[in-house]
């Protein structure tokens, strides 16, 4: 069987699909990915075929800013996530991706498509080809009103391609793979008959390269170790890191902060001896050495919770405010 996976061009959307893609490969199926050209090299470095399709995250955001200026101007938070994001995904990202994705599907001829639940062009392309599709969770289930808003926005694209995906834009039609722990997941998951719970037992962030654990990690003093990450999208502002590190610098803890691919730790200046800065280290390699995680509230919360790490969530944008509230409600973390 040939399976085409699609995702937005970011690690937070690609990495959750990696364990499923690798499981399919081990089972003898042929797997490929379709994502923005700017991210294809990351997919290929993880060992998968990659087809370019759609806009980069920055181009997607800029196009959405021009298309929905009032909603784009909303401050980061729940309202912006529920009103601006679905229109960006369905009204900007999906049409741009569909124009590239439909020809890929016609040429490569997959038997099944698997897409991250924020990537909304896959159901359109799959429906045109007459094949089934499955969505894969990122973290929490999207609020129903948000999914309906995306479905309404996607309707114009569906009409232009001559398909009818219904009010939810094709989401949850055949199968939804839910990797979120039940204790954290939104109650709306019970209203999705095709939801199938899964637990990823394979480290997904190895998709980001063959990085090694720095030798100094195993030589840290015997005291609690705090890990700081702001993910791979909201990690561009050094001021955010400085504020967190300043608060931790005088504490009797080890601090490990990863700044992101290509980031220069020297940009944050001199740090106390207990603070260690790195550009990128796979979280899967660090988890066994950590006691607490300070996070923006993206996909990293799932492997952290799998290890039983308490969380301090500092949401920056997108779904992170929802995720922070869920962690607080479940008693697994605090929100700052």
Protein language model regions, located:
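Nucleotide-activated sugar donor-binding and catalytic core shared by glycosyltransferases
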Residues: 1-8, 19-32, 45-47, 143, ...
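A short, glycine/small-residue-rich beta-strand->loop->alpha-helix junction that serves as a flexible
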Residues: 5-18, 235-238
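Short internal beta-strands
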Residues: 30-36, 255-260
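Conserved nucleotide-sugar phosphate-binding/catalytic loop shared by glycosyltransferases and other
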Residues: 32-83
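A nucleotide-sugar donor-handling region in carbohydrate enzymes
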Residues: 36, 40, 152-225, 230-235, ...
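Conserved nucleotide-sugar donor-interacting segment of glycosyltransferase catalytic cores
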Residues: 59-63, 86-165
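Alpha-helix C-terminal capping/helix-to-coil transition sites in glycosyltransferase folds
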Residues: 107-109, 172, 288-289
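Donor-nucleotide binding loops and adjacent catalytic segments primarily
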Residues: 198-292, 300-301, 321
């Amino acid at each position: 069987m040939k399976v085409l996976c699609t995702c937005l061009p970011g690690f937070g959307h690609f990495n959750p699909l990696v364990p499923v893609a690798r499981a399919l490969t081990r089972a003898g199926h042929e797997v490929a990915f379709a994502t923005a050209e700017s991210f294809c090299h990351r997919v290929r470095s993880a060992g998968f075929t990659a087809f370019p399709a759609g806009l980069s995250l920055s181009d997607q955001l800029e196009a959405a800013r021009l298309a929905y200026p009032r909603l784009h101007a909303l401050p980061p938070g729940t309202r912006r996530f529920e009103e601006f994001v679905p229109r960006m995904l369905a009204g900007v990202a999906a049409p741009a991706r569909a124009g590239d994705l439909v020809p890929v599907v016609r040429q490569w001829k997959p038997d099944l498509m698997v897409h991250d639940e924020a990537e909304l062009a896959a159901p359109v392309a799959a429906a045109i080809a007459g094949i089934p599709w499955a969505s894969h969770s990122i973290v929490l289930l999207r609020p129903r009103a948000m999914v309906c808003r995306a479905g309404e926005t996607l309707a114009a694209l569906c009409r232009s391609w001559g398909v009818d995906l219904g009010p939810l834009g094709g989401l949850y039609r055949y199968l939804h793979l839910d990797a979120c722990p039940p204790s954290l997941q939104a109650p709306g998951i019970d209203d999705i008959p095709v939801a199938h719970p899964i637990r990823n037992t394979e480290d997904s962030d190895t998709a980001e390269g063959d990085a090694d654990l720095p030798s100094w990690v195993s030589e840290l003093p015997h005291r609690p170790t705090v890990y700081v990450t702001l993910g791979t999208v909201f990690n561009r502002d050094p001021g955010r890191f400085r504020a967190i590190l300043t608060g931790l610098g005088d504490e009797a803890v080890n601090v490990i902060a990863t700044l992101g691919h290509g980031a220069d730790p020297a940009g944050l200046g001199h740090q106390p001896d207990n603070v260690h800065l790195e550009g990128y280290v796979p979280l899967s390699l660090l988890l066994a050495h950590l006691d607490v995680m300070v996070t923006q509230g993206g996909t990293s919360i799932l492997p952290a919770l799998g290890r039983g790490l308490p969380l301090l969530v500092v949401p920056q944008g997108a779904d992170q405010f929802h995720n922070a509230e869920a962690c607080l409600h479940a008693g697994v973390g605090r929100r700052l």
